[in-house]
Amino acid sequence: MVEDNRDSADSLRLLLGLYGYEVAVAYCGHGGVRAAQQYRPDVVLCDIGLPGLDGYAVARRLRQNPSTAKARLIAVTAYGRDEDRRRSHEAGFERHLVKPVDPDDLRRALDCPTVLN
């Protein structure tokens, strides 16, 4: 997970733990790219408004790297306009969830590999 707000990251980490996921957290875009390259996760939850490297750039970098290109990318962000969703899709995100995230929506996004932006 890539989330610069530590309270949000902690809350999501606890929820994901209840769902049975192992979670590594990075608090900035550059750290998120490094962590994904190191851990090679199946799923990456990523905020858009990150310091240094925004979530769109994180997604593009992960898609371009063979070791992370197949990870499922889910945007978890306060950016909820149609334009934000379009940019997420273009950057490589498969899903776009708007904060505060409904736990049921998150669970569906994690369980369903189909693109349902």
Name each region found by the language model.
Residues D4, C28-G31, D54-R60, D102:
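Acidic catalytic/metal-coordinating carboxylates
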Residues R34, Y56-A69, L110:
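Short amphipathic alpha-helix used as the core "switch/output" element in two-component signaling
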Residues V101-L110:
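C-terminal output helix
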Residues Y39-L45, L50:
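Active-site beta3 strand of CheY-like receiver
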